[in-house]
Amino acid sequence: MAAAPSASGRRSMSWGSSISQSFRQAEADDPFGRAASQQGHDDDEENLRWAALEKLPTYDRMRRGVIRTALLHHDGGGDGGGAAAAAKDGRMELVDIQKLAAGNLGRALLDRVFQDDSERFLRRLRDRIDMVGIELPTIEVRYEQLSIQAEVFVGSRALPTLTNAATNVLQGLIGRFGSSNKRTINILQDVSGIIKPSRMTLLLGPPSSGKSTLMRALTGKLDKNLKVSGDITYCGHTFSEFYPERTSAYVSQYDLHNAEMTVRETLDFSGRCLGIGARYDMLAELARRERNAGIKPDPEIDAFMKATAVQGHKTNITTDVTLKALGLDICADIIIGDEMIRGISGGQKKRVTTGEMLTGPARALFMDEISTGLDSSSTFEIVKYIGHLVHVMNETVMISLLQPPPETYNLFDDIILLSEGYIVYHGPRENILEFFENAGFRCPERKGIADFLQEVTSKKDQQQYWYHDQERYRYVSVPEFAQRFKSFHVGQKMQKEMQIPYDKSSTHPAALTTTKYGLSSWESLRAVMSREWLLMKRNSFIYIFKVTQLIILAFMSMTVFLRTKMPSGTISDGTKFLGALTFSLITILFNGFAELQLTIKKLPVFYKHRDFLFFPAWTFGVANILLKVPVSLVEAAVWVVLTYYVMGFAPSAGRFFRQFIAFFVTHQMAMAMFRFLGAILKTMVVANTFGMFVLLIVFIFGGFLISRNDIKPWWIWGYWASPMMYSQQAISINEFLASRWAIPNTDATIDEPTVGKAILKSKGLITSDGGFWISIGALIGFLVVFNILYILALTYLSPGGSSNTIVSDEDSEDKTDMKTRNEQQMSQIVHNNGASNTSATSSIPMSGSRSTNQQSRSQIVLPFQPLSLCFNHVNYYVDMPTEMKEQGFTESRLQLLSDISGVFRPGVLTALVGVSGAGKTTLMDVLAGRKTSGVIEGDITLSGYPKKQETFARISGYCEQTDIHSPNVTVYESILYSAWLRLSSDVDTNTRKMFVDEVMSLVELDVLRNALVGLPGVSGLSTEQRKRLTIAVELVANPSVIFMDEPTSGLDARAAAIVMRTVRNTVNTGRTVVCTIHQPSIDIFESFDELLLLKRGGQVIYAGELGRHSHKLVEYFEAVPGVPKITEGYNPATWMLEVTSPIAEARLNVNFAEIYANSELYRKNQELIKELSTPPPGYQDLSFPTKYSQNFYSQCIANFWKQYRSYWKNPPYNAMRYLMTLLNGLVFGTVFWQKGTKISSQQDLFNLLGATYAATFFLGAANCITVQPVVSIERTVFYRERAAGMYSSLSYAFAQACVEVIYNILQGILYTIIIYAMIGYDWKADKFFYFMFFIVASFNYFTLFGMMLVACTPSAMLANILISFVLPLWNLFAGFLVVRPLIPIWWRWYYWANPVSWTIYGVVASQFGKNGDVLSVPGGSPTVVKQFLEDNLGMRHSFLGYVVLTHFGYIIVFFFIFGYAIKYFNFQKR
């Protein structure tokens, strides 16, 4: 490979990483291994086949392979059957590699060549490469004097309140005046180091130390707003010389995937897009050298390597390798899912995120917190496999782990310890303890080294590791550690290496990738089109629902505009036809509105793929554009076919098809417009608000609401810029230039020869037939422009959002003077056994107060009742999933828990442990009463009495695995709110607040007191901060029984230690605490008193005490014949999971569940359960006088307090609401400027009627749509809070409705003042206040209707689709497009049922119901305005009282339906 590489040859050549993301290692040997030197395993047939292969031209030879005949007839499935059959059948055949690369044949070959030993297989590959002297490309990554800074607001100025949002806008417009509290935060500070190939590096550090920032910097994925200095090079080359996004792979800690795709489909897509790199060129060179040297490789290894070099297929054998390596093969064909779609588990999603990057050809891997949600055994196997890639295939890998167990830690070669932006240590793992011992700190026995490293730099944890008895402890700061490292021998060696520049000429030509994408543009488009088509099929319900909705609307509209009621030939007849055409047009436009939400939903995954260079952004845009063309064809065809002849439009085939063309192009234009808006606005709340504003502008200047002749000169450009005007013009010309409208015009005021042209001219439309095609051309122009803008937005706009927490002023000061401050001491827990056997008290330890420095404060003592929880023979069943039925399962239900018995006692900390899928969370949900579906069998008692859920909710706490909190409140507000509603009403306000402060100090959230919670992965708190908040929210409830589902998952070792100290202290107060736990370190695991161990299938295999150093657990399992003894210092938790794994069970031929059921331990547990299932003498069943801790009034006040604060800190919702109100008012005011001062003609009155209709409908509709995402997010939080028994559903509904009413009143006042003055309505008090009332009332019922739809549907998306069905109906029967007297009698009831019609009635009747001005009527005699309203519109001033009452009625009805649905509809499936 000395020659200059081709374009493909310059790609990253990590064929090894894509070939073999391998299996967890078992103990089986590979009976099929072959030496590279051609020993005597070849038979004559194999030689003949190989000789035939060698005679083929190079191109054909690379696409053919020789494999055993048995594999060709194997059905795949990965069960090893193909390997076994192939071992018996030695016949060989020549096969097409294209067929081998995908499908069952490839999986059978995979089973055969791997044999569950990834290292051995990789070494066979490496031996083949080394035999012909090919050098694998390697990458060395250097970073020198790298510093990264961010400019951020700190303290209260950083909170996104409405005032801060307004201040930010003003500062952006007029510049900064005075201090803005924006400060420079150092994320990384002058760090340097070398990440070497063939060495696996572990990155450790506490939260906010800069780990993710360092990884993003090294992979070229930093936010452009950050200030960066220093150099980063790959093999001496800077980022400008290659593409770091493809040379390296960054595995993010956030799991962003398409929920509707399966695991296999997700990895197939990433593998297809990332390409094969230089794998094909390397393989061709390998084959050439082997041929010249007369070397014959193992045919099946050869076929396998060729299969991995096939590019562009929908699936590839490398996907199956990755699935096996990450343990995802068991869920390969299950959809990933999300919060609304049931899919794979959180740990499996994390592995999918890792697998996405492993399928590509990158040879430098940077993996950020890949173990979150995984048990320690799975983490060990995955890291071990990656270590094989590093050591055998010379890859470069850096991995950050939160809580690496010792056995995983020992797999790494180098350690980087990062803290406060400084590198404390970077060098070999063997020397790091020596470094800290030189500084005076030693890792204790039975303490994980990784845990020690993350705690030793912390002020609050450092002192416990000081071991110099002769010297007094002194806090060693992080900068001092960093300085000490520079003088340490490892640091000095690193500095010397950094001084020697890397020889760029020695860089392997395939090491750095110089092509931007893995596929050609055409192949990328095909791949994305295939993926988007798959997503459309998976979301087919949405498209079917939209068509069904369109059919219903078409039926309703064609019965309103029935041809028997639609005479033609006069100008007045034309008005009704214009109404029918306009309604059709509005329906088509509204139908395109759903594209807004569909686009925004796809953006997070798109941005990830775009930034990782999966494909060019334009391919995603073009794919979505092309795939929506059939949607427009179907929906336009459905509407036109159903309505055209029934409504009585011009009976001509040509005009029928021309209307279809107009509606098709309009629908395409609408979807393009909303796609573009979604791409630039990015969030549902902002996009919904602005989308409705754009729709309003398009509608106002569409040519129907106000004719061109009546538009003010300063707005005439808006008329020509409105796409709806061209649509209106096209369909109007198509209709009114038909022969039946060619009747001579008799109206002298309009100078046109025919009635049809007179109608067109009265609306300011073109009167020639050529205008139709001009309008179609203009619409196509809009369509093209919107699509181009959409693609440009996708290409150049950043994702937006921030995952940074707010830095408090105090925290900022702390970091400045940290060296000079003394450590604050944590006060000890105070135990109080209480005055009786059935009561106890708790107190919370306080850390030193900032304000008083080291002065301790008094502790709050709150009473609680110790309780034991017993469960006996518990079983849990769910309906058999559809996927399993399709695979042949015949049972009607699936058992998830099988005969589980146990007891949780006061003062005993119990660990609930098991591998993923063992049923830990399921059991906890069952015991806590959180299951919403399925069948539960068995006995559950609380201190001897049957558990009553309502009572149990009052005295229990549940820290869920997913941290669900209201995003727009602060940490302190979240905790105070929980305490307010869950502590007894006897606790006064001051005591409650002090208790909250103590809990916050206990879990170290006091520094984050005023930080916004935010949305996970988008804004606000980090994962570990959010986890601590979850625990604090439950602790302030002062519960007797606490369930914690993986409280340490997602936390680093130090944060996990903080949490476990908190948990231990809680148990010591006499509470009953049980925790599920995934990957505990030794010290965390041994902080538990008892263990309940589950195996897959929900069966108990151990329940009992751990004992000192876990000796009771170890003795129990070591007594089982064949179980290997635990080695000294090994983590008992890891050992326990390994020796009880399904593989170990199969090897020992035992069933640990049966062994436990027949053990003495089981009998003792049954005796204990029997004892505790009987109430103690004199003990009464737990009961409370009220269902909730607080009365209904207090619940309402607390809920309103939280909602008010949440709304105040939600500018994207409320600031946008008021901004759009202001813009709407100004637009209406200037378009209809002083139209209300003089009404002399029918057109004047209809202009005002149109203004009233549009002013009411569009802003109200915007409120209805934009409130839905807000309510949907809060509803998820509501489900958790309701399950905790915090409040009644009605108090929650009342509070949310009240806060909306307040904002709506202010919105209505602002809107009324603007448009009332600018339009020029009569300034009389009664008219003004009537107008204001109807506007405010309409905003309220629109908003409540949107809230009601969310409460009645499982998702905001479905509610949004329903809105697009209801709003056109309200629009149709509002009394504007068709006035009430002209509505067919069979639909007139809907006019009275339509709230919008009542609002228009109220506004028009209150403003003009007593108007005595003379009104000229075309074709009729003059009349007064009052009489015209009564005769033609059916509106009377005397009816206003009923109109007012009806508005109150709608508000009350919508509120009560919202409250009822919130209470009785539960769409959370658990």
UniProtKB/Swiss-Prot annotation:
SUPFAM superfamilies reported for this sequence: P-loop containing nucleoside triphosphate hydrolases (SSF52540)
Keyword Transport: yes
Biased composition (Low complexity): 832-843
Binding of ATP 2, residues: 914-921
Pfam families: ABC2_membrane (PF01061), ABC2_membrane_7 (PF19055), ABC_tran (PF00005), ABC_trans_N (PF14510), PDR_assoc (PF08370)
Start-end of Polar residues biased regions: 9-24
Transmembrane segments: 541-561, 577-597, 629-649, 660-680, 686-706, 772-792, 1215-1234, 1249-1271, 1301-1321, 1331-1351, 1359-1379, 1389-1409, 1439-1459
Membrane topology: Multi-pass membrane protein
All residue ranges annotated as the ABC transporter domain in the record: 172-445, 869-1121
Record's GO cellular component terms: membrane
GO molecular function (one): ATP hydrolysis activity
Family matches, as SMART domains: AAA
Record key words, sorted: ATP-binding, Membrane, Nucleotide-binding, Repeat, Transmembrane, Transmembrane helix, Transport
PANTHER family in the cross-refs: OS02G0318500 PROTEIN, PLEIOTROPIC DRUG RESISTANCE PROTEIN 1-LIKE ISOFORM X1
Family per record: Belongs to the ABC transporter superfamily. ABCG family. PDR (TC 3.A.1.205) subfamily.
Protein name: ABC transporter G family member 48
This protein's encoding gene: ABCG48
